[in-house]
């Protein structure tokens, strides 16, 4: 049995190792996480074969569920992208006279972000911000920051996004509940971190026109886009199916055949599978796409997820090493003796790791590995709440090490200092508000 000092030192050094290898030596996060896994296993006295077996089971156990859901989610997002469904939502919201332009961008980011990776969402939806900025003579910062803050929020707290799904799965949280809580917290955090924060700045927010190099980017002709009803039905269908499963678990007898049916169709794999074929028809065939064209789009989408699958698999390996060694159990005792609330701890660890490793996904996986061992000591706090707390922490600290920071800077034509002052601050405020919302939820449920 290793001393607590040895355990803490091993964990801290492993985190430093991950940060250094990614930031300093430019290792891929997959390699960095595997290296840290071998390091922890060695320091905790695991045998070589035990380490390899733990890593294999960690990768396989994690991707066995997540690979299918992420793959299906990628198809859904790709169909949203190529059909123009995301633009349809934005154009429809523009007609709501009672909504300000910045609030519209938050809603666009939250709704469309459910099925889009955050960077893809920025690239796909920023032309809408350009269009509104030109029409209303509004600073681009006032539109782009709420959009990107909302996309980041939904990316971190709402399954079926890969990191949020990983956290929910590893903590044993109900995915339907996490979706509902995540949307509530994400909406509140995005509105306060985006529009309200920028309203507070007032005239101190500089006017930024659409950069000349992006002046040609335009929203597609509205006549070519799918209808709003078809778009919303496709986006919300998998979420509705997963929520039906959650409701059934709370209110139905588990022996009934109808309960089994709802459990089946509400499983994330089944729900996403059904949604993909609905998307093929509603956003593809009805938009005059051939099956050959949709196959090409599907294959192109799959090419983009190899990176995230490898990172998530390595995160599962790191988690498995912590559990297989005695580190996880000892860490649970140490953390409980710190007398820090587990929600605050989960948020803080994710926040710090995001700033350090430049990836919200890696930060959330690392935070899960650190926080998960102590959950049995707090039976009154649901795993769904801890999942939201981890995601809330990962929203913040979008700084120069994060690719999203540079996307915002480039598209807004902002200086480095301006991007720090307005976008980094917006994500940090959103993160703090999300933490407050998580605490509030913990008192209610």
What kind of feature is each model-predicted range?
Residues 7-19, 26-46, 67-72, 230-243, ...:
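Hydrophobic mid-bilayer segments of alpha-helices in multi-pass membrane transport proteins
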Residues 131-239, 404-441:
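Membrane-core helix-loop-helix motifs of multi-pass transport proteins
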Residues 8-13, 31-34, 67, 102-107, ...:
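Hydrophobic alpha-helical transmembrane segments
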Residues 48-135, 288-375:
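Membrane-embedded alpha-helical segments and adjacent helix-loop junctions characteristic
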Residues 186, 342-445:
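C-terminal transmembrane helix pair
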Residues 2-11, 62-71, 117-121, 184-187, ...:
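Structural signature of hydrophobic alpha-helical transmembrane segments
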Residues 99-114, 137-156, 174-191, 342-354, ...:
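Alpha-helical transmembrane segments of multi-pass membrane proteins
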Residues 2-5, 180-296:
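Long, contiguous bundles of hydrophobic transmembrane helices that form the permeation core
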